[in-house]
Amino acid sequence: MGENASFWESLIYAHPTCVTWKQEAEGSIYHLASILFVVGFMGGSGFSGLLYVFSLLGLGFLCSSVWAWLDVCAADIFSWNFILFAICFVQFIYVTYQVRSVSFDKEFQELYSALFQPLGISLTVYRKIVLCCDAEVITLEKEHCYAMQGKTPIDKLSLLVSGRIRVTVDGEFLHYIFPLQFLDSPEWDSLRPTEEGIFQVTLTAETDCRYVAWRRKKLYLLFAKHRFISRLFSILIGSDIAEKLYALNDRVHVGKGFRYDIRLPNFYHTSLPETPPVPPPRRLQRRSSGRPRPGVPNCSSPRKQ
């Protein structure tokens, strides 16, 4: 203990104390560096915040280097400040390169602005999601099928970007799928990662549609690597299923003017006027809400672009 005490005493008290203080202030370069440090440490998060912090801190260290070289004439102070300036400069270049490299096609940029950006998802996280679907938007032509009842396997998760999808079971209309809604969220949620299944409904394009598709196995690998993305998709899929249940609730009738409420366990029904299905407000573009055209849909495979 005595040796430790003597060490700390020598470290703290061995240096000579300042008897007289300088009356004159340091040069303007020193004060400019201090101001840049204060303002620089007020930066926020994200790419913009990093660029802000590294640029101002780099300028502050550069001013400190100039001050140490011209006024103090201390090689060690100059060396350390110049090294810190070089580190900030390299970090600024690296962040700038990352910002320039994170760019998407128009449809993916619109999808980010409409769905992911309001949730606070950064561009780096969104880039991982886009790369998982190979940055590809698939085209589904009018009256072509995305899935057929009892035939199409459940091997992917798709999100509608534009157009409108009609969902039917045994030829009976259930509900529509609009932009920014998943095409197969109930099927995805009904299966475990190791299970396989087939669609119990038919999904047909009412208009020319564009959608993004993530392969099941590839998406689960992404979830395993990034738990945040897994929680994000869990929230999005749960919200999407809830919207589909509300849309399906409008299709359950007792008689004229009466409807069941499938959200309640006893199927409590209320008297409401019949209204056509209305798309949710969260979508990329507005489409007409006409009824499905008669005829047998052409269920050829969609085109990739």
Curated annotation (Swiss-Prot):
It is a multi-pass membrane protein. Residues 273-305 are annotated as: Disordered. InterPro entries: cNMP-bd_dom_sf, POPDC1-3, POPDC1-3_dom. The keyword Membrane applies. One of its GO terms (biological process) is regulation of membrane potential. Keywords: cAMP, cAMP-binding, Glycoprotein, Membrane, Nucleotide-binding, Transmembrane, Transmembrane helix. Glycans are attached at N4, N298. The keyword Chloroplast does not apply. GO terms for cellular component: membrane. Expressed first preferentially in atrium and later also in the subepicardial compact layer of the ventricles. One of its GO terms (molecular function) is cAMP binding. The chain crosses the membrane at residues 34-54, 55-75, 77-99. Its main location: membrane. May play a role in the maintenance of heart function mediated, at least in part, through cAMP-binding. May play a role in the regulation of KCNK2-mediated current amplitude. Belongs to the popeye family. PANTHER family: POPEYE DOMAIN CONTAINING PROTEIN, POPEYE DOMAIN-CONTAINING PROTEIN 3. This is Popeye domain-containing protein 3.
